[in-house]
Amino acid sequence: MSIMQASCIALVSSLTLTVIFLPLLIKFMHSHHEGQEIRDEGPKWHQKKSGTPTMGGTIFVIAAVISVIWVTAWQHSLNKVVWILVISLLGYGIIGFLDDGIKLYYKRNLGLRAWQKLALQIIIAVVIVLIASSDHFNFGLYIPFAGVVHSVALFVIFIIFWLVGFSNAVNLSDGLDGLATGLSVVAYGTYAYIAFKQKNFAILAFCMSVIGGLIAFFIFNHKPAKIFMGDAGSLALGGGLATVSIMLNRPWSLLLVGIVFVCETASVIMQVISFQTTGKRIFKMTPIHHHFEMLGWSEWKVDIVFWIVGLVGSILYLAIWG
């Protein structure tokens, strides 16, 4: 069986598990009157989404983990790379699960405090570094225009920054029905293609497993969303993406492949700096998808335009660097 055939089985497995169990989670949350609390600072028309079931990411994360483990084990390819990817996805997913759980329990929009979330994110990143370093891991980091720099300290700092940064970047992008889901399908699809070209079955199977779960999740997450992925999904997706880019030895690719995630994060940083220094806001509201909403764009229009931008970023990367 070819690596693509086995990876497609992983995709179908993850998709099937998500389709089966996600409706059960939605039904459970409705029966217990559990749902997302919408922040007051967001667009006023988002308040009608209050009470929508959340934590849907828990299902597709578990589905992806189960699928990639059993398919790689079946193909005798369950190696350290698979475990690093699984720990990344599951580890950041657990942080998000705790965050979502606190929000639901206390019926508020605030979950883990910022320092608590950051500390846990750093711990997961350090665990990944420790696991990778136990197998003669290459700590060379390519710096654009400077070449490869061999520094363990620099590489460890970079991995922590990359994983924490992109887990939060995807989290910031999860503000509209289906937005982060579609963007993640494009990004993971791009890395699946790269992994296939490199004949890296572990990463290919992982990406396809995540894609399968996301495709199934989108059925319930497109506007009007029947369930949100919550931090359990968005933090996991971002952590997984960052780890995949590093394991493929192409970390900088994420600046183009994940260009929308980068722009969402940059808009928040720019807004804060501008307001703190000049008292003026650059955007009507951040993250930037809300800015376009405030300009009168519908959610579907924002989704489609942002998905296209994400796709163009991925195509540009593949066209230039393959």
Curated annotation (Swiss-Prot):
What is a single molecular function from GO for this protein? phospho-N-acetylmuramoyl-pentapeptide-transferase activity
Q: Which reaction does it catalyse?
A: UDP-N-acetyl-alpha-D-muramoyl-L-alanyl-gamma-D-glutamyl-L-lysyl-D-alanyl-D-alanine + di-trans,octa-cis-undecaprenyl phosphate = Mur2Ac(oyl-L-Ala-gamma-D-Glu-L-Lys-D-Ala-D-Ala)-di-trans,octa-cis-undecaprenyl diphosphate + UMP
Query: Which cofactor does the UniProt annotation name?
Result: Mg(2+)
Q: What class of enzyme is it?
A: transferase
Q: Which UniProt keywords apply?
A: Cell cycle, Cell division, Cell membrane, Cell shape, Cell wall biogenesis/degradation, Magnesium, Membrane, Metal-binding, Peptidoglycan synthesis, Transferase, Transmembrane, Transmembrane helix
Q: Which Pfam families did the record assign?
A: Glycos_transf_4, MraY_sig1
* Principal location class: membrane
Query: Which sequence ranges are marked TM in the entry?
Result: 6-26, 54-74, 82-102, 122-142, 145-165, 176-196, 200-220, 227-247, 255-275, 302-322
S-S bonds: none
Q: Which pathway does the UniProt entry assign to this protein?
A: Cell wall biogenesis; peptidoglycan biosynthesis
Q: Which PROSITE patterns match?
A: MRAY_2
- InterPro entries in UniProt: Glycosyl_transferase_4, PNAcMuramoyl-5peptid_Trfase, PNAcMuramoyl-5peptid_Trfase_CS
Where in or outside the cell is it found?
Answer: Cell membrane
Instruction: Give the membrane topology.
Output: Multi-pass membrane protein
A Gene Ontology cellular component where this protein is annotated is: plasma membrane
Instruction: List its EC numbers.
Output: 2.7.8.13
Any one Gene Ontology biological process term? regulation of cell shape
Please name the PANTHER family in this protein's record: PHOSPHO-N-ACETYLMURAMOYL-PENTAPEPTIDE-TRANSFERASE, PHOSPHO-N-ACETYLMURAMOYL-PENTAPEPTIDE-TRANSFERASE HOMOLOG
Q: Which family does it belong to?
A: Belongs to the glycosyltransferase 4 family. MraY subfamily.
According to its UniProt entry, the function of this protein is described as: Catalyzes the initial step of the lipid cycle reactions in the biosynthesis of the cell wall peptidoglycan: transfers peptidoglycan precursor phospho-MurNAc-pentapeptide from UDP-MurNAc-pentapeptide onto the lipid carrier undecaprenyl phosphate, yielding undecaprenyl-pyrophosphoryl-MurNAc-pentapeptide, known as lipid I.
Q: What is this protein called?
A: Phospho-N-acetylmuramoyl-pentapeptide-transferase
Which organism is this entry from? Lactobacillus helveticus (strain DPC 4571)
Designated gene of the protein: mraY
